[in-house]
Amino acid sequence: MTAICSLFAFSSCGESKDDKIYVITNAFFAPFEYYKGSEIVGVDVDIMNKVGEKLGKKVVIENADFGVIIESVKNGEKYDCGAAGLTVTESRKEQVDFSDAYFTSVQYVIYKADDEGMKAKLKTAADGKTKCVYWSDLAGKTLGVQIDTTGNIYANLEINGEGKEGDPDYYKGELNGTGATVKTYDDAMIAVNAIPSGCDVVVVDQLPATYICSKNTQYECAALYYDENTATEEQYAICVAKGKTELLNAINDVLKELGKDGIDALVKKHLGLEG
């Protein structure tokens, strides 16, 4: 009976959708969202729970494939917002509204710790401390990615380029013509576990990469740069269905209250770096 009430919460069990905030996520993107036992936890979950407290509503977090998050929030039939380490892009902004950005990330590459070929390509970025490899160093490799993520988008862009040669906005791509390919997986950890039989390396955002490598010492990771000064910078935000102004304002209020220090504290908490 409990399971039935959970599935049909909108029409039964005495609670309406107005009493809750339904949040869709993909719970395989630690430290932002991940399973702890049967519970979904993470930075985004902590943020949304604070939003629920502000609005006096219960927050319900549900897991789904990453690729359906934007569309599910856009149609507004069930989910009020999406919190999944979502990168703000122009195409996504056409479909949903985004909160203020709360975290800046770059793309990373994960490889086997005993991959001497990759280790030989390691460099130090212009800041003097960031370990990196260049996109061009991935020539000829099979790049594993989580489907529909920005890692997937960037990998496709660098392999296939954009526009037509001769056009003013033409971009060849760092890996175009090198024999590099993309292989998609349902989540980053599945992709990582496929190294080296299914793919050579995995392209994923910074903190999920460092989290995975901290828990699995047979892998290492490095930032992906174009040259010593230029990385693939992107910003995370929470998305809501267009027109949900009250919810969007509450999310922005919470993000403002947390500030950079508060977000950093949540990140450290879920990376196990507290204390």
State what each model feature region is.
Residues 26-27, 103-111, 206, 210-255, ...:
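Periplasmic-binding protein-like
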Residues 32-46, 117-123, 136, 173:
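Short, solvent-exposed loop/beta-turn-alpha elements that line the ligand-binding surface or hinge
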Residues 51, 73-74, 138, 192-196, ...:
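Hydrophobic residues within well-ordered alpha-helices
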Residues 58, 125-140, 145-172, 176-182, ...:
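Ligand-binding clefts/hinges and TM-proximal coupling segments of bilobed small-molecule sensing domains
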Residues 58-137, 223-231:
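Acidic, polar ligand-binding/catalytic clefts
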